[in-house]
Amino acid sequence: MQFSTTPTLEGQVIVEYCGVVTGEAILGANIFRDFFAGIRDIVGGRSGAYEKELRKAREIAFRELGDQAASLGADAVVGIDIDYETVGKDGSMLMVSVSGTAVKTRR
């Protein structure tokens, strides 16, 4: 499965548009990691715990996107948009959502 943020794939022709596909992931952040990440951010370092959670959520969302596209018979997803948002009463969860258009292509 190919993924692209662009509306086309260089060197390939889109022969069929299969529909809009989406993938979402919501992950809760551990309170202790949040505490130590906050301390690290105060002293100017990067938060490895947050970066790991973000990467994990993005991978899950893209896996869902690809699975949905494959179920439509597509071999690529174009025009992908990636959104990040904190959710929950206290912003303790991270949501990653991806969407795009599933397509069939040929060279």
Curated annotation (Swiss-Prot):
Cited InterPro entries: UPF0145_dom_sf, UPF0145_YbjQ-like
Domain of life of the native organism: Bacteria
Gene3D superfamilies tied to this protein: Hypothetical protein apc22750. Chain B
Entry-linked Pfam families: YbjQ_1
Recorded family membership: Belongs to the UPF0145 family.
Protein name: UPF0145 protein ESA_02470
Lineage: Bacteria, Pseudomonadati, Pseudomonadota, Gammaproteobacteria, Enterobacterales
